[in-house]
C-alpha cells in the first residue's frame, strides 16, 4: 500500500495484446497498460520418461512444489530418494536430503557433478564429498522409465540398471518461461529477447529475470536479476539505463563441498589450470595470453573468490 502497488495472487494471465496494450486474465478481465514488464521466471525441464509412475515424478520450482515434495516424503515415510540430474539443483537437493537422514541415488548422463558449471576435476571433488556422506551416483545412463514397485518406485536406466526408491525427484534444470510472450508475437530465442534496456520487440514491453535473454545472455541467478531490476526501475522512472553485468560468481549450496564458480563464456578460448588437491581445488580458466576468464573453487579454495572475481572481465560491461 505504501508503494501504491496492487498484488493479485492466484491470478493467471491468459494472453497479451501488444497492439491494444492489454493484458487478458483468465475469467475475462482485461487490464490496459502503458508499460508492461514480463517477469515470468523459469520452468522445470521435464525429460521424456515413460512408465506407469511417470506422473509421480516430482519437480521443485516454487514453494508449492516444495510443500508437495515434503508432504510426499512424510506421507510415504520415505527414507530413500532417487534424483534425476546431478547439476546445480540435483547436487543441492542431494546434500540437503543427506543432511536430513535420507539415502540418495542420483543419475545423470554426463560424467560428473555440476558438469555444465565445473571442469571434471572440480566436479569429481564435489562427487567424492557427497559420496562420503552416503550418496550414490550413476553417471552416463539416462533414466527412461519410472514404475511402481510395491509402496515405492523403480527407476529404469538405459544401461539396464534399476534404482529402487520411495520417491523420485526430477532435477535436470530450468529454462526461461516464454510461452505467454511468444503467443503474443514477442521475439523469443533461448529466452524473451531484450536489448540492454530490457526492451522487447513489442512497444512498451520489457522482460527481466529468469525469463529474459538480455543482449544474448540467459543468467538464471539472483545477482543478474537484481542488476536488471535496478536498471529497469531507472528506465521506467524516466532515466534510460543500460543493464550492466559485472563478473558474478555463483555460490552453490553444497556444504559437504562448498563451491563458487564463475564459468567462462561458452565461446571463450583458453584452458583450465588446477591447483590443490580435492576437495580444496582452485581451477582457473585462462586465455593463451594468461587473462583470467573464469574460475571454479571448491572446499577451502572458495576463500579466494573475492580476489579472483576482481580479475575477471565483466559479463556485460
Identify the residue ranges that each predicted region occupies.
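Rossmann-like dinucleotide-binding cores of NAD(P)H-dependent redox enzymes
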Residues: 80-81, 88-145, 225, 243-251, ...
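A short, polar/charged loop-to-alpha-helix boundary motif
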Residues: 301-316
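Glycine-rich dinucleotide-binding loop and its adjacent helix/turn
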Residues: 40-100
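Redox-cofactor binding/interface segments in oxidoreductases and associated redox assembly factors
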Residues: 25, 38-39, 170, 207, ...
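N-terminal Rossmann-like dinucleotide/flavin-binding domain of flavoprotein oxidoreductases
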Residues: 1-33, 118-136
